[in-house]
């Protein structure tokens, strides 16, 4: 997690409340105001989004897993590249788990295309070739 201030976040894909399980011994659930963007999940402890957000950046996340439905709530876990697990829950109808999954997969796809493009451009430079445009 990083702390983001100053610059406004990119375009908002979804905004609303999630509950995050604390890392403390008691593991209490704490409500967070959340903003989902194309680059990550911004968590605010204040409902009015005052102060700095903790950001779970998609470049540091491996996957969303362990989705469970209990009553009207959905429980899910975000797993970092380092293996840390961060637990969340939300109302089933809010579809946070689906929205985060779609945004994370979209981010990973864009990164894979960018890395492939860079690798092809590097190979073309090494071979003295010119590469046709792949789009944006």
UniProtKB/Swiss-Prot annotation:
InterPro entries: PH-like_dom_sf, PH_domain, PHLA1/2/3. Keywords: Cytoplasm, Membrane. PROSITE patterns: PH_DOMAIN. It is a peripheral membrane protein. One of its GO terms (molecular function) is phosphatidylinositol phosphate binding. Residues 12-105 form the PH domain. It is found in: Cytoplasm; Membrane. SMART domains: PH. GO terms for cellular component: cytoplasm; membrane. One of its GO terms (biological process) is positive regulation of apoptotic process. Plays a role in regulating placenta growth. May act via its PH domain that competes with other PH domain-containing proteins, thereby preventing their binding to membrane lipids. The PH domain binds phosphoinositides with a broad specificity. It may compete with the PH domain of some other proteins, thereby interfering with their binding to phosphatidylinositol 4,5-bisphosphate (PIP2) and phosphatidylinositol 3,4,5-trisphosphate (PIP3). Belongs to the PHLDA2 family. This is Pleckstrin homology-like domain family A member 2. It comes from Xenopus tropicalis. The gene is phlda2.
């Amino acid at each position: 997690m990083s702390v983001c201030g100053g610059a406004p976040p990119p375009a908002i894909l979804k905004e609303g409340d999630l509950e995050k399980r604390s890392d403390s011994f008691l593991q209490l659930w704490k409500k967070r105001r959340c903003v989902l963007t194309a680059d990550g999940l911004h968590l605010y402890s204040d409902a009015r989004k005052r102060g700095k957000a903790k950001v779970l950046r998609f470049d540091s996340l491996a996957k969303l897993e362990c989705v469970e439905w209990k009553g009207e709530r959905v429980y899910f876990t975000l797993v970092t590249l380092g293996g840390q697990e961060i637990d969340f829950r939300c109302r089933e109808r809010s579809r946070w788990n689906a929205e985060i999954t779609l945004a994370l997969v979209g981010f990973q796809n864009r990164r894979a295309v960018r890395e492939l493009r860079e690798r092809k451009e590097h190979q073309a430079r090494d071979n003295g070739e010119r590469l046709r445009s792949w789009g944006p």
